[in-house]
């Protein structure tokens, strides 16, 4: 080591690096700003069209017809709140502490904030401290805990020229190191930057509705102008009436009702899951989970409890019985600085008086797979993997491994401990085997079996030994436990090729976890990922839906879609049920909403076509006004579908939501179109007044809508019958109330119009039943 490194950087060198921007000051921010979120949810084509219609209605002072705009505002507000919450969630993510760093500059040791470090700074790190920046060891020795970053539960030995990763911790020892990377180039910074990418909202229902809105958005302006000019110039209606009638057609084409119900249903699902101790941090993830067909599990904390415990201690020599073994382990763990889960389990089991003072200690290393300690009056005690310490295989160790346990051997030597060149001594004697077990979660087997029955594929992705993971998976009832691979021994290309067919992935790095998820998504799967460590973050962010345990690392909780507050994997099916309930029920009642979209479009086309025929008596003006549609919606699209979305429905989600819903809505929409054409022509031939025609059409429109409500309520139950009675009764009560009649611009069915209504509804009911049965068969 040269003098410059011992002295550290000079103030001049520090200023030069600061001027060059080589400073450890980096904040990983989300890619989406608050303004971008607001803009994305407010300044949309859908909102712009509704706003333009609202302005037109306000301009002609048609105040009673502006009720619809409250729905638009609520939709935009819900979208903003949902995305802001997701942004806030990832903004909080931070893998680094803010503790002062001992830094050598101009030969003096000073305490600096991590963000004040520059490239080339010499820093001194001791046990228990976090590494503030990627650095190379200049002198000293340390055991580093990289579990938070890499998933490796064992400590990693770092000697001269070893690379220290930012975000990891020194478990033992002390080192003098030189900053190798700063700011965005640091390992932890790159990890945070990837994790802080705000994923776009993934809702197939909303995307389907956006497609529909996109289509209507392209035609709505020319349609609106044509309808307005037709009513104003050709039919000679007043400006207010022309605007109101034209607006009704345009509003009917925009699917705002089902968009509102979707958001409301998801919000209720969030509340229900919250009552069941499941925190939903991203509303649309409920829908996504309902569509999941590939669930990737982390072994620790998911299938197992994540709580290591000593299952058994098996003495291997008559010289040292169980009491002697316990005394040695008690002394060893009392002096040991090892903090990995296995050491903690042994320490918890063996407590008491320390019989042997410590002379020297060599911490456990994941490279060596063993640790050692020289104890006064005993010798050098070794604790580690049997295959690394013993020359021959111990049958009992193999049996324990096949049971899914971690096995350690306690051994003794009389040779002195060499810290500079640690190696296995020639006179080593095995004293005992320790079987360490991470218990299977109660109910895990039933949960896995149920998920399989629901057509959900399962994969286990773990940083542990694949043989151990396979054994644990077998005990948990995992069907494909025999299909596993050691990811530390294959390339990325090989991993991508094996991702679809392999069930268990062991020794997986954070990058490989993400790659597995990406490969599965490219294969067409909707993926969910469970995890609890920082090493899972990249995969959790990549998955369509991320689920973490509340007992997991705080960083994973901050970026997860769902957090299991009870840290119980067995809650996953309940979340699946809730998602399927929402998605299936929305698909079930969607035709009720799409009837209006279809008939509004068809009637608008007919109205425009009628103006091109050249005869004034054939010109058709859109027959409804916004307040009429709004009132009918209360009893057709409002309360009944809302109540029906709460019913249990856990069948697998069907594809092609929009296409199937449109086909189911088409017969009813055609009935409305036929009603308008027939009543207009027949009424004119019979000399009916516009009020009589408007009244009959109002009743027909409401009644055709009720046919779809009846279908949605089948098979009938007491509550569903009461729902139908409330809807039909509410519709009739408002239609017969004089004040409301005036507002709706209708009256009561007369002796001339009532029989026509009865005959038409009888025919429509028969047609509706026949078409519904035909569609059900298909």
Swiss-Prot record:
Keywords in alphabetical order: ATP-binding, Cell membrane, Magnesium, Membrane, Metal-binding, Nucleotide-binding, Phosphoprotein, Translocase, Transmembrane, Transmembrane helix
Family as reported in the entry's similarity comment: Belongs to the cation transport ATPase (P-type) (TC 3.A.3) family.
GO cellular component, one term: plasma membrane
Active site: 298 (4-aspartylphosphate intermediate)
Primary localization: membrane
Highest taxon in the source lineage: Bacteria
Cytoplasmic topological domain residue ranges: 1-37, 85-209, 261-586, 646-663, 709-716, 778
Bilayer topology annotation: Multi-pass membrane protein
Species the sequence originates in: Streptococcus pneumoniae serotype 4 (strain ATCC BAA-334 / TIGR4)
Residue intervals on the Extracellular side: 58-64, 230-242, 607-624, 685-689, 740-757
Entry protein name: Probable cation-transporting ATPase exp7
GO molecular function: ATP binding; ATP hydrolysis activity; metal ion binding
Signal sequence region: none
Transmembrane region(s): 38-57, 65-84, 210-229, 243-260, 587-606, 625-645, 664-684, 690-708, 717-739, 758-777
Gene: exp7
Localization, UniProt: Cell membrane
Known catalytic reactions: ATP + H2O = ADP + phosphate + H(+)
EC number(s) recorded for this UniProt protein: 7.2.2.-
PROSITE patterns documented for this protein: ATPASE_E1_E2
Binding-site list for Mg(2+): 532, 536
């Amino acid at each position: 080591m040269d003098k410059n490194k011992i002295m550290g950087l000079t103030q001049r060198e520090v200023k030069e690096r600061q001027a060059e921007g080589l400073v450890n000051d980096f904040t990983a921010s989300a890619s989406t700003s608050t303004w971008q979120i607001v803009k994305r949810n407010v300044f949309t084509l859908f909102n712009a069209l509704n706003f333009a219609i609202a302005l037109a209605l306000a301009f002609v002072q048609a105040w009673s017809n502006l009720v619809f705009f409250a729905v638009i505002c609520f939709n935009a507000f819900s979208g903003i709140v949902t995305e802001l919450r997701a942004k806030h969630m990832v903004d909080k993510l931070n893998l680094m502490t803010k503790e002062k760093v001992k830094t050598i500059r101009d030969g003096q040791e000073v305490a600096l904030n991590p963000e004040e470090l520059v490239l080339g700074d010499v820093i001194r790190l001791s046990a228990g401290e976090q590494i503030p920046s990627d650095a190379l060891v200049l002198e000293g020795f340390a055991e580093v805990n990289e579990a938070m970053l890499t998933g490796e539960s064992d400590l990693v030995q770092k000697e001269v020229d070893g690379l220290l990763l930012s975000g990891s911790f020194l478990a033992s020892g002390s080192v003098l190191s030189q900053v190798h990377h700063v700011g965005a180039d640091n390992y932890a910074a790159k990890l945070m930057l990837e994790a802080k990418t705000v994923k776009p909202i993934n809702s197939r229902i909303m995307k389907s509705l956006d497609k529909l809105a996109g289509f209507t958005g392209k035609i709505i302006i020319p349609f609106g102008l044509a309808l307005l000019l037709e009513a104003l110039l050709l039919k000679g209606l007043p400006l207010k009436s022309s605007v109101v009638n034209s607006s009704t057609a345009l509003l009917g084409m925009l699917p705002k009702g089902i968009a509102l119900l979707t958001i409301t249903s998801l919000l209720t699902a969030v509340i229900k899951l919250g009552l069941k101790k499941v925190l939903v941090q991203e509303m649309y993830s409920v829908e996504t989970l309902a569509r999941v067909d590939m669930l990737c599990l982390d072994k620790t904390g998911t299938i197992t409890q994540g709580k290591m415990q000593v299952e058994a201690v098996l003495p291997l020599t008559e010289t040292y019985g169980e009491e002697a073994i316990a005394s040695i382990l008690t002394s060893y763990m009392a002096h040991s600085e090892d903090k990995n889960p296995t050491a903690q389990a042994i320490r918890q089991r063996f407590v008491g008086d320390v019989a042997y003072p410590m002379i020297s200690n060599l911490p456990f290393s994941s490279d060596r797979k063993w640790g050692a300690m020289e104890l006064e009056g005993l010798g050098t005690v070794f604790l580690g993997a049997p295959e690394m310490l013993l020359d021959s295989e111990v049958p009992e160790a193999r049996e324990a491994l096949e049971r899914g346990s971690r096995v350690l051997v306690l051994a003794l030597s009389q040779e002195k401990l060499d810290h500079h060149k640690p190696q296995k001594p020639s006179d080593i004697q095995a004293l005992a085997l320790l079987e360490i077990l991470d218990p299977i979660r109660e109910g895990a087997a039933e949960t896995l079996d149920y998920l399989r029955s629901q057509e959900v594929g399962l994969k286990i992705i773990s940083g542990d030994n694949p043989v151990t993971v396979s054994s644990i998976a077998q005990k948990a009832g995992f069907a494909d436990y025999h299909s596993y691979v050691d990811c530390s021994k294959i390339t990325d290309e090989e991993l991508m090729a094996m991702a679809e067919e392999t069930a268990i992935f062991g020794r997986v790095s954070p990058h490989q976890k993400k790659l597995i998820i990406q490969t599965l998504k490219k294969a067409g799967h909707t993926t969910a990922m469970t995890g609890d460590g920082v090493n899972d973050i990249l995969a959790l962010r990549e998955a369509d839906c991320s689920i973490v345990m509340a007992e997991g690392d705080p960083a994973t909780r901050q970026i997860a879609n769902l957090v299991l507050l009870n840290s119980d994997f067995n809650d996953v099916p309940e979340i699946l049920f809730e998602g399927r309930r929402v998605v299936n029920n929305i698909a079930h009642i969607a035709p009720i909403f799409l009837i209006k979209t279809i008939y509004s479009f068809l009637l608008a086309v007919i109205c425009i076509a009628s103006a091109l025929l050249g005869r004034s008596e054939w010109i058709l003006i859109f027959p409804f006004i916004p307040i009429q549609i709004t009132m009918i919606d209360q009893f057709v699209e409002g309360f009944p579908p809302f109540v029906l979305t709460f019913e249990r429905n856990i069948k697998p989600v069907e594809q092609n939501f929009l296409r199937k819903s449109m086909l189911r809505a088409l017969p009813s929409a055609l009935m409305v179109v036929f009603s308008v054409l027939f009543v207009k022509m027949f009424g004119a031939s019979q000399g009916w007044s516009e009020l009589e025609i408007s009244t009959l059409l109002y009743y027909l429109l409401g009644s055709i809508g009720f046919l779809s409500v009846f279908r949605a309520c089948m098979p009938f139950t007491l509550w569903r019958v009461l729902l139908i009675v409330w809807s039909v009764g509410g519709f009739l009560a408002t239609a017969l109330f004089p004040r409301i009649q005036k507002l709706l611009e209708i009256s009561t069915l007369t002796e001339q119009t009532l029989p026509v209504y009865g005959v038409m509804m009888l025919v429509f009911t028969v047609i509706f039943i026949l078409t519904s049965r035909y569609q059900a068969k298909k």
